[in-house]
Regions:
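Conserved small/polar residues in nucleotide/adenosyl-binding loops
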Residues: 1-6, 143-145
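Nucleotide/phosphate-binding catalytic cleft detector across ATP-hydrolyzing
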Residues: 4-138
C-alpha cells in the first residue's frame, strides 16, 4: 500500500524495519522524512530508534509492538495526566518500566514497549518493599501473567 493510500485509509501508526538499520539508520530516517513529506501525521516507529538489536526478528517484533501500542498509550497517558491534574495532583507523573525502575509519562509515550510487562514488575517490587517494611519477613509473592 502506498503512502497516500495509507493516509486515506486512516492508518495511525507505521513501523519501519530495515534489515541493516541497527548498523546505519540513514534509510529508516529517510523513510520517516518521506512519510512526513507526503503528509503522514501519525506515529512512526523506527527499528533503529526502538531497538539497537542486530537480530532482525527481535528488532522487528519490538518495533511492531511499539507502533501498535504507541497511539493507545499516548491517549491513555494524556487522559490520565489531565484527570490527575483536575484532581489537584501536582507531583511527578511516572510509569513503571518492564525492566524495573520508572520513566516519565513523556518517555512512556515515546517508548511504550518498555511498559508492556510493568504490572508484574511493579507487583514484585511492591512485595519486596512490603517485606522490607515488615522487617524482612519471609514472604511468598505470586504474580500471574
Amino acid at each position: 500500500m502506498c503512502i497516500r493510500d495509507s493516509i486515506k485509509e486512516g492508518v495511525t501508526s507505521i513501523a519501519v524495519c530495515l534489515i541493516n538499520a541497527y548498523a546505519n539508520n540513514k534509510h529508516e530516517k529517510n523513510i520517516e522524512k518521506l512519510l512526513r513529506k507526503f503528509g503522514f501525521k501519525g506515529y512512526i516507529s523506527l527499528s533503529s530508534v526502538v531497538s539497537g538489536e542486530y537480530r532482525e526478528y527481535e528488532r522487528t517484533t519490538t518495533t511492531v509492538i511499539d507502533s501498535f501500542v504507541k497511539a493507545r498509550m499516548s491517549n491513555y497517558l494524556n487522559s490520565l495526566r489531565d484527570e490527575l491534574k483536575n484532581l489537584g495532583f501536582n507531583g511527578n507523573f511516572l510509569v513503571t518500566r518492564s525492566g524495573s525502575g520508572s520513566m516519565t509519562f513523556d518517555e512512556a509515550e515515546e517508548r511504550p514497549f518498555e511498559t508492556i510487562m510493568s504490572g508484574p514488575v511493579a507487583g514484585a517490587e511492591g512485595a519486596g518493599e512490603l517485606s522490607r517494611q515488615k522487617n524482612n519477613i519471609n514472604m511468598l509473592s505470586l504474580i500471574h501473567i
